[in-house]
Design a protein with these regions (language model features):
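N-terminal "domain-start" segment that seeds a small globular fold
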Residues: 8-35
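Short loop/turn microsegments at loop-to-beta-strand junctions
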Residues: 20-21, 43, 118-120
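Short active-site neighborhood of thiol/selenol oxidoreductases, capturing the structured segment around
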Residues: 36-53
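Structural microenvironment flanking redox-active thiols in thiol-disulfide oxidoreductases
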Residues: 56-95, 105-112
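Thiol/disulfide oxidoreductase modules built on the thioredoxin-like
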Residues: 90-98, 104-151
Length: 156
């Protein structure tokens, strides 16, 4: 069972490791996304659920980060943890997002990546290695956070 993070100040924790396991999930429209499809880009993998208040609170900042850094060298992949598509669609109609929302029915990927608390995020560098992890809500559009992620972008 997953828990929602409490309102503590989350921060980017530096790591240098391969991603916990391969990512291959469909989005809400049925398109399959693989982490390998985004090789050469910075990928922010965010595990979330509509029932998780900190997850809902950080979504606008994830959307701002996606818009600020663009899509050619950066992408957010929001992995919804085991919720019905209708609930996710209702959430997205109220809060449209500028990045793919992937479906982890049965929480297989969530377990493989050892996610225990939501939201949980992993920042993957263009070479495919995990460079940062975050457990809990983070303001992804804060200047210090944007600066650290921007340093990972190709050509930086």
């Amino acid at each position: 069972m997953l828990a929602g993070a409490t309102a503590h100040a989350a921060e980017l924790k530096a790591v240098d490791a391969p991603p916990p396991s391969a990512l291959e999930l469909s989005d809400i429209s049925g398109r399959v996304h693989r982490l390998s499809d985004y090789r050469g880009r910075v990928v922010l993998v965010n595990f979330w659920a509509t029932w998780c208040e900190p997850c809902r609170e950080e979504m606008p900042s994830l959307d701002r980060l996606q818009k600020q850094l663009g899509t050619r060298s950066f992408v957010v992949l929001a992995v919804n943890v085991d919720e019905p598509e209708a609930r996710i669609a209702k959430f997205l109609s109220a809060m449209p997002l500028d990045f793919p929302v992937l479906l982890d029915a049965g929480s297989k990927l969530t377990r493989a990546w050892k996610v225990r608390v939501l939201p949980a995020s992993f920042v993957i560098s263009p070479d495919g290695r995990a460079r940062y992890t975050v457990t809990g809500e983070l303001d992804w559009s804060a200047p210090a956070v944007v600066e650290r992620i921007a340093k990972l972008l190709p050509g930086q």
